């Protein structure tokens, strides 16, 4: 800037991205969302100590804080006339719409996130949902003919505006950091061609260096002929001789920080350094002075925080936000107030456990017009174009449905077994435990060993499943499975898979749905003294009810679009697998069938249906009719096939591609076999039922469902990574 900035400050900064130099800028605005980290000194003066120009995270947290506080203190907020943050976000959406190249009438905007593992992913999903734009990862986007496109089930859709939450150097592995897996190959080239606008502009991370604060007052006076309205914390860059001399001479009064890069985690407070640490720091500065800055140590003001010990003082910082398209800047009323994790913490770090507070700005007489102007959207909601479902989101919804149904099935089996074990002991207890042990081992829930007493199957016949070893000790095994087992297929494992897939589509799930999913977390270590059948039953029952709430919200609140269909396809496939496994395991259990069949009906929540229909004890023909053939029973295998067929036909009509005719024929064939199968044995016996026919039929159904799952994956989720089934 006319010689006010040393060249070394620019060219030695890793944030200077040479490929981004000269990129076209919509409206000549590089920063569309800006954040300023502010500190209030003991004298009450506010100063800026850091600029956030990459992505200015935290605005979504501020909005969420207001939502929470509004529910807790609604009267206080209304009586105090606190300004709402909502107009800021409506203005932000309007600003993003105005950035579309060539003034497109219905621009497609996306929020680019590093993914669910990022520390601020919650805010990414929250902000995308609140702005009404798709939340995407780098793998969801591709560049075709210099156009950034969103991969959807309908095909590639051109993207006009990218609101990024990925650091600029990671946004394009072709021209920036080659090792990045977070960005979009070709994004810089598409931006250079003027076909997409990235907000904030690629390369804007350069300005996050605290070294610029040392020169900002002079630059402001040169460009605007005025002093900074909001002064910065006095800063000295050690890359200049004068700054280096001042920092080394006044180290005990300063805070020393890295000047460049992502090494902000290490901060040295001069007054806390020992003599040895001070010497070591001076050696580091002397070796590479351009990589360090010194800032005046301004101790933040404090705010009261309620803890288990009562009210405590905590240091507080404020991040303020501005959104602009170059003409009408809009300031977020309030901002994100952050409080230190402990009373003696000299600074505030969210990574170090700091908390946040809602910040109130009171309304004045001339605020209404400003908020109305900011709230006015560029287009009416009826004019906004619908965005297709990204393939990755469809994949995550599909597996969310599968894992949720798998967990529910496991829990239903455990609940039934625990209920049986909790019943009064009798001479038949040993036989009961033996049947239950064979059943749960056949399903695959318990550690198993081959049962030596079972004769090998004849040629062409299916072999028996493995059975639980040490069946008389069934109670101990079931309790161990509930409390201790955390391997594949366990309760904690399935909970983790559910939350992982739900997190990938967090912007597509309602707040009520997330409240239910938040309860699906492992309970932690349960003391041995508390482990009992009664306690395990309560734990399992609570999880079943939470899953029922999740399923109910999905059925009642989700629009019947492709997302819901893939979620329900996953549920129907998994329920079909579970039913074939349950019926096969039951068919292999020796002994009198009636008690076991009643257990199966209980697991499938179909005991009442059977009693109302047959008015008799459970027998194989009636159970097969209820759990296999009944197209009106939501737990029956035939119902799952019918639902899958309806979903596949709807998807085929919507996308004009879809399932081969062979899969439609397969479903029809399985349905026909289910309805026409004859289970009368060739040689009359006491049961009057041919179990081998049922076992073969269930095996055929399971193979067909597996092939159908693979075909869905290949056709709709081909660009995603394969999942472990």
Segments and roles (model prediction):
Residues 1-28, 41-43, 53-109, 117-124, ...:
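Alpha-helical transmembrane segments and their helix-helix packing motifs
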Residues 1-354, 358-374, 380, 391:
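Domain-scale recognition of functional cores that engage charged ligands
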């Amino acid at each position: 800037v006319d010689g006010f900035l040393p060249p070394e400050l620019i060219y030695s900064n890793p944030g200077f991205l040479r490929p981004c130099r000269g990129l076209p800028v919509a409206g000549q605005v590089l920063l569309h969302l800006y954040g300023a980290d502010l500190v209030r000194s003991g004298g009450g003066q506010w100063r800026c100590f850091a600029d956030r120009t990459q992505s200015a995270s935290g605005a979504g947290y501020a909005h969420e804080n207001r939502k929470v506080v509004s529910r807790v203190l609604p009267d206080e907020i209304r009586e105090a006339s606190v300004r709402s943050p909502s107009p800021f976000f409506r203005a932000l959406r309007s600003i993003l719409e105005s950035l579309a190249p060539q003034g497109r009438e219905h621009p497609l905007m996306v929020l680019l996130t590093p993914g669910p593992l990022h520390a601020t992913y919650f805010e990414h999903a929250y902000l995308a949902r609140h702005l009404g734009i798709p939340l995407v990862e780098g793998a969801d986007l591709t560049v075709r003919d210099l156009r950034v496109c969103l991969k959807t089930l309908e095909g590639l859709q051109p993207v006009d505006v990218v609101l990024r939450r990925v650091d600029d150097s990671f946004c394009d592995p072709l021209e920036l950091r080659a090792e990045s897996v977070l960005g979009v190959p070709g994004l810089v080239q598409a931006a250079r061609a003027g076909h997409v606008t990235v907000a904030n502009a690629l390369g804007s991370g350069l300005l996050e260096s605290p070294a610029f604060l040392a020169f900002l007052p002079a630059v402001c006076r040169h460009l605007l002929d005025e002093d900074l309205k909001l002064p910065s914390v006095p800063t000295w860059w050690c890359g200049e001789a004068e700054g280096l001399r001042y920092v080394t001479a006044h180290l005990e009064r300063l805070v020393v920080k890295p000047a460049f890069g992502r090494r902000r985690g290490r901060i040295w407070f001069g007054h806390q350094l020992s003599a040895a640490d001070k010497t070591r720091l001076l050696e580091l500065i002397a070796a590479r002075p351009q990589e360090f800055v010194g800032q005046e140590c301004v101790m933040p003001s404090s705010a009261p925080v309620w803890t288990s010990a009562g009210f405590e003082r905590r240091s507080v910082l404020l991040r303020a936000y501005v959104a602009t398209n170059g003409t009408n800047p809009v300031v977020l009323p309030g901002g994100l107030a952050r409080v230190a994790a402990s009373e003696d913490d000299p600074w505030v770090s969210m990574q170090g456990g700091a908390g946040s507070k809602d910040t109130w700005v009171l309304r004045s007489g001339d605020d209404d017009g400003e908020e109305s102007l900011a709230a006015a959207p560029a287009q009416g909601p009826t004019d906004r174009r619908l965005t297709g479902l990204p393939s990755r989101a469809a994949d995550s919804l599909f597996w969310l449905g599968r894992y949720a149904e798998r967990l529910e099935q496991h829990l239903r089996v455990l609940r039934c077994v625990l209920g049986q074990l909790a019943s009064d002991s009798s001479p038949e207890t040993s036989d009961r435990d033996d049947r239950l042990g064979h059943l749960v081992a056949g399903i695959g829930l318990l550690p198993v060993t081959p049962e030596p007493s079972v004769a090998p199957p004849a040629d062409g016949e299916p072999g028996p499943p493995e059975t639980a070893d040490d069946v008389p000790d069934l109670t101990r095994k079931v309790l161990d499975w509930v409390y201790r087992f955390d391997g594949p297929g366990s309760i904690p494992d399935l909970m983790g898979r559910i939350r992982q897939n739900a997190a990938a589509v967090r912007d597509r799930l309602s707040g009520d749905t997330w409240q239910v999913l938040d309860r699906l977390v492992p309970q932690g270590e349960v003391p041995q003294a508390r482990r009992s059948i009664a306690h395990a039953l309560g734990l399992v029952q609570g999880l079943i009810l939470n899953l029922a709430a999740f399923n109910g919200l999905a059925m009642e609140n989700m629009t019947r679009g492709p997302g819901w269909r893939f979620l329900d396809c996953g549920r129907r496939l998994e329920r079909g697998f579970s039913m074939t496994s349950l019926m096969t395991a039951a068919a292999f259990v020796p002994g009198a069938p009636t008690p076991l069949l009643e257990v199966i009906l209980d697991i499938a929540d179909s005991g009442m249906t059977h009693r109302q229909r047959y008015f008799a004890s459970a027998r194989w023909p009636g159970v097969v009719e209820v759990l296999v053939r009944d197209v009106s029973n939501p737990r029956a295998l035939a119902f799952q096939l019918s639902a899958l067929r309806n979903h596949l036909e709807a998807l085929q009509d919507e996308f004009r591609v879809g399932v081969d005719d062979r899969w439609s024929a397969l479903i029809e064939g399985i349905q026909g076999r289910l309805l026409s199968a004859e289970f009368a044995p060739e040689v009359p016996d006491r049961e009057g039922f041919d179990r081998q026919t049922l076992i073969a039929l269930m095996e055929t159904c399971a193979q067909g469902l597996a092939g159908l799952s693979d075909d869905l994956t290949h056709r709709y989720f081909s660009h995603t990574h394969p999942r472990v089934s």
